[in-house]
Amino acid sequence: MASEYLEHKLALLPDQPGCYLMKNANAQIIYVGKAKNLKNRVRSYFKSSHTGKVAAMVEEVADFETIVTSSNKESFLLEITLIQKHQPYYNIKLKRGTGYPYIKITNERDPIIKITGQVKKDGAYYFGPYPNVYAAEETVHFIQKVFPLRRCHGYQGRPCLYYHLGQCLGCCFKEVPEEEYAVQTKRIKSFLNGNTAQVKKQLTARMERAAGQLEFERAAEIRDQLHYIEVTVEKQKIISNDKTPRDLFNFYLDKGWLSIQVFFIRQARLMKREKRLFPVVDTAEEEMTSFILQFYNRRNKLLPKEILLPEGLPNQEIEEILGVPVRTPQRGEKRDLLDMAKENAILSLNEKFRLLEMDRQKTTGAMKEITDELGLPTGHVIEAFDHSHIQGADPVSAMVVFVNGEPAKKLYRKYKLTTVVDHADEAASTREVIFRRYSRLLKEEKPMPDMIMMDGGPIQMEAAKDVLENQLGLNIPVIGMVKNDKHQTADLLYGDDAHHVNLDPRSQGFYLVQRIQDEVHRFAITYHRKVHTKHSLSSRLDEIHGVGPRTRNKLLKAFGSINKIAVAPVEEIRALGINQTTAQLIKVSLQGQAEVKKGSSHD
C-alpha cells in the first residue's frame, strides 16, 4: 500500500517513455528501471500484489523520481548509464571492468602477438574471447613457435634469444620486410579462424623433413605441435555451418530467479559459455535487455558480427544501440543453438534450486537437532543476547535473531543499559534487557521467539527466567551458551539445574550454536566500541571549562573527532558560535591532553 505522499506522486506520472529511480528512506537509489509508459509501469508496483524480491523492493520504496526521454532507445541508454552510476541494490549489475582474454596482433611496423583484456580501436586484430587466460596463453605460445613475428623489444644490434629459438623474425638485429610479416599475420588469422588443415600439412612436412635429417628432437617438438591442434582446436565440436563470429543469449525465469546463458560462437565452435543467475524485480524481458546492454558496455567492447536472441526482446532497439545485426531464428541450426542455451539455463536454475533446498534442509535440520537435544518442540526463531562493558563502564546489550537457522539482521536490536551498578553485574544487565525486550513485544502484541539463548552461564539464565516468568508471565525456554578456556563454543546449558546438553560438536546443530554465539558477541562488541568511543570523546570535551552539552555536540558534529578539533584553527572553532576565550581554551586543553598522552606512551 503506497503512502499518501507516494499516491500524490503516482497521480502526476506522465504517459511518456523514460526511466524511474526508486529510493529508500535514506534517499538511496535502490532500483532503476525503464518504461515505454512511465505512468503504467511505476503505478503497477504499488497497485498489484508481489512476492519475493519485488515485494522486498516495493516495501523499501519511500520515494521515486522519473526522467522523461524522447524515445525508447534513449531510455535504454539512460537506464544503463544510471545503473552503472548508482549501482542500485535490486538491479542486475555487471562491472564495467569485467572482461575476457583476447589474443591481439598489434598494428605496428614489427607486430607482436599477445594476450589482452582490453579491446581498443587501434587498428590491431583481436580474436576471442577465450574461456580463460590459460587457454589464450596456450594458443599464443603455439603461434609464437609456429608463426613467429616479433618477440623482443625491437632493434638492439644483436639477435635475441627468441630468434635463436625460432620464435622471432629478427627485428632485433635487422630490418624484417613488411611482406614477411604480412604472410605470417595472414597465416595466424587463418589458423585462429579455424583453418587448421593447411597448418597441419605444413607441420607434417616439417616433421618429416626433420626426421629425415635425423633431427629427432626437432621432429618430436613439431609432433607435439600437431598434437596440440588435434586435442585443443579440432576436438571442439563444430556446431555451425559458417564461421561468422556470433553471440547467443537465452534465459529461463522461475520463482523470481532469472537464469541466463551466453554462448560465444567462434570458428563455428562454441568457444566459451557464460552463465549467470539473478533474483529479479522487473519482467524477464526487461531484465534480459538490461543485462545484454550492460554486457556490451564493459571494458571489452569487441562485438560479434551477429547476435541471436529469443522471442520477446526489443531486437530493433538493441540493434540500433549496438550497431550489430540482432536476429531471432525460427528454424535450423541457429534455432537449435538457442534451444540448447534455453535447456542449459533451465538446468542451471534447477541446480540452484536444489542447492538452496539443501541449504534449507541443512539449517532446518540444525534447528531440529538443537530442539531434539533440548526436548523441545520444533522451533523456528531464536533470539540471543550478550552484554559488553569495560569494568562496568558504558554497559550495553545486543540481541541477534536467527530464523530457521539464518540470521535475520533487520530484526537485530541494540540496548544502552541504564541500570546503575557499582561494577559489571551480569544479572542486573540481563534483567534489564530481557524486561525491555519482551515487555515491548507484549505491549505491541508481537510474536515471541521459540527460545532465548544467553551468551553466558547459570547467572544470566536464572536472571532471564526470573523476569520472563515472575514479571512478564511468559514461558519461553532459556538456554545458556558456554565457552571453553579458549573462548570457543563448548556446550549448551538448559533446565532448572542448568545441566549440560552435550550437543555433538560435529553436528550441524553445534555449528549453528557457534554461529549464533559468534554473531551476538560480534554485534555486542561492535556496538560497545562505538558507544565507548563516543563517550570518551564527550568526556574529554566536558572537562574543558566553558564547554557544555550544546557546545560539545556542535564540535563533534562539525569536526567528528578530538584530533580534528585539536588541529583546527581557532577561527574555525569560533565559526560555530563559540567565543574567542572558549575557542582558545579548547585548543590549549586538547593540545595539552595530546601532549600528556604522547608523553605517557613513551614511558
Swiss-Prot record:
UniProt keyword terms in alphabetical order: Cytoplasm, DNA damage, DNA excision, DNA repair, Excision nuclease, SOS response
UVR domain ranges (all copies): 197-232
PROSITE patterns: GIY_YIG (PS50164), UVR (PS50151), UVRC (PS50165)
Chief location: cytoplasm
Superkingdom assignment: Bacteria
Single GO cellular component term: excinuclease repair complex
Gene Ontology biological-process annotations: nucleotide-excision repair; SOS response
InterPro entries for this protein: GIY-YIG_endonuc (IPR000305), GIY-YIG_endonuc_sf (IPR035901), GIY-YIG_UvrC_Cho (IPR047296), RuvA_2-like (IPR010994), UVR_dom (IPR001943), UVR_dom_sf (IPR036876), UvrABC_protein_C (IPR050066), UvrC (IPR004791)
GIY-YIG domain ranges (all copies): 15-92
Gene Ontology terms for molecular function: DNA binding; excinuclease ABC activity
Subcellular location per the Swiss-Prot or TrEMBL entry: Cytoplasm
Gene3D superfamilies in the record: 5' to 3' exonuclease, C-terminal subdomain, GIY-YIG endonuclease, UVR domain, UvrC, RNAse H endonuclease domain
Pfam (any one): UvrC_RNaseH
Quaternary state and interactors: Interacts with UvrB in an incision complex.
Role, per record: The UvrABC repair system catalyzes the recognition and processing of DNA lesions. UvrC both incises the 5' and 3' sides of the lesion. The N-terminal half is responsible for the 3' incision and the C-terminal half is responsible for the 5' incision.
Family stated for the protein in its record: Belongs to the UvrC family.
Protein name from the UniProt record: UvrABC system protein C
Native source organism of the sequence: Limosilactobacillus fermentum (strain NBRC 3956 / LMG 18251)
